[in-house]
């Protein structure tokens, strides 16, 4: 058993009743290792609703900020998009919307953020997070089209129009 396997085993052996702090302690050791199995394991944790919210948010931030291969970036972006539409907590959805700002070049991310920003029944915090992640994409054709749709929104329209003006598109 190598170090990655050992740490994954330790994490799993702690079980569902282990505190978030105990799980985070193991994750900190695991994250130091450069091994593709680490990303795979973190993705499993991110998608596991039985994990404590603190663990899932920590994993999300690690995946957002950590070194990823091109293939891993696509996989992580897909997992983050799933969190936007699932029954996850508002905080996790908010963190996913913000994290997707790092993945705007990946197919499917901009439409997912646009749909969320345009959804009037969602929380304004979540919609604004999606908008700021869209803004990070810069003035691409797809992003500009989404922002034009959003520019008439009662809550976000003013901020959107300001971005379009700053980009010299309105």
Where are these regions (language model features)?
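Amphipathic alpha-helical scaffolding segments comprising HEAT/armadillo-like alpha-solenoid repeats
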Residues: 1-14, 35-47, 69-85, 104-118, ...
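Alpha-helical segment of the N-proximal tetratricopeptide repeat
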Residues: 13, 25-33
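Alpha-helix N-cap/helix-start positions at coil->helix boundaries
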Residues: 16-21, 36, 51-54, 89-91, ...
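Conserved hydrophobic register position within alpha-solenoid helical repeats
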Residues: 23-26, 56-59, 96, 127-130, ...
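Structural signature of alpha-helical solenoid repeat scaffolds
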Residues: 28-31, 47, 61-65, 101-102, ...
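Long amphipathic alpha-helical scaffold regions
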Residues: 53-67, 125, 129, 137, ...
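Eukaryote-skewed repeat-based solenoidal scaffolds used as protein-protein interaction platforms
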Residues: 80, 84, 91-98
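Extended alpha-helical scaffolding segments
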Residues: 122-159, 169-170
């Amino acid at each position: 058993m190598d170090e990655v396997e050992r740490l994954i085993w330790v994490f799993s052996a702690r079980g569902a009743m282990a505190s978030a702090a105990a799980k985070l302690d193991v994750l900190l050791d695991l994250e130091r290792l450069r091994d593709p199995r680490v990303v795979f394991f973190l993705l499993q944790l991110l998608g596991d609703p039985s994990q404590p919210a603190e663990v899932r948010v920590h994993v999300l931030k690690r995946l957002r900020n950590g070194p990823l291969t091109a293939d891993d970036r696509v996989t992580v972006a897909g997992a983050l998009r799933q969190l936007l539409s699932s029954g996850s907590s508002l905080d996790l959805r908010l963190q996913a919307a913000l994290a997707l700002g790092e993945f705007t070049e990946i197919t499917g991310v901009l439409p997912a953020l646009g749909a969320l920003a345009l959804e009037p029944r969602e929380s304004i915090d979540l919609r604004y997070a999606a908008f700021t992640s869209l803004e990070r994409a810069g003035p691409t054709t797809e992003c500009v089209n989404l922002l034009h749709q959003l520019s008439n929104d009662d809550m976000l329209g003013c901020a959107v129009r300001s971005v379009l003006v700053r980009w010299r598109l309105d």
